Amino acid sequence: MGIFAFENEQSSTVAPAKLYKALTKDSDEIVPKVIEPIQSVEIVEGNGGPGTIKKIIAIHDGHTSFVLHKLDAIDEANLTYNYSIIGGEGLDESLEKISYESKILPGPDGGSIGKINVKFHTKGDVLSETVRDQAKFKGLGLFKAIEGYVLAHPDY
């Protein structure tokens, strides 16, 4: 088993607390609205706090698949949110899980900086560049889609 870690940073014009709320507390409602393949997000275990497991269902090219999302830690005061993709058809078979540690920081002009550490836990000793790049692309797409939703809904 190998662990491959990567860091990424993304800026936003949305205020930190508002962006954090959209990316965490309200994401179950927002994500199916802004990411077309995602049909639903449902809690399958837990009460919404650490340890909660969610099933995210998507349809790609007429095929339904899902991933299991486990909330590892949440700290609203420090705007941190850690979770892992722990299973499902949407998790590449070469991976045991993907862990995400995210933090929203104040950015310039009242905006935000989203920092994320991603750890790929592989079954073997190699991480495919394709798997890595797809996960990074999806993460950035999710961030930008939720940011776009907040910007398009000023009363959010």
Curated annotation (Swiss-Prot):
GO terms (BP aspect): abscisic acid-activated signaling pathway; defense response
One Pfam family here: Bet_v_1
InterPro entries: Bet_v_I/MLP, Bet_v_I_allergen, Plant_def-hormone_signal, START-like_dom_sf
Binding site residues for trans-zeatin 2: 28, 54
Gene Ontology molecular function: abscisic acid binding; calcium ion binding; cytokinin binding; melatonin binding; protein phosphatase inhibitor activity; RNA nuclease activity; signaling receptor activity
Keywords, ordered alphabetically: Allergen, Calcium, Cytoplasm, Hydrolase, Metal-binding, Nuclease, Pathogenesis-related protein, Plant defense
Binding-site residues, trans-zeatin 1: 8
Function: Class II ribonuclease (RNase). Binds to cytokinins. Interacts with melatonin.
Family of this protein: Belongs to the BetVI family.
Full protein name: Protein LlR18A
Organism from which the protein derives: Lupinus luteus (European yellow lupine)
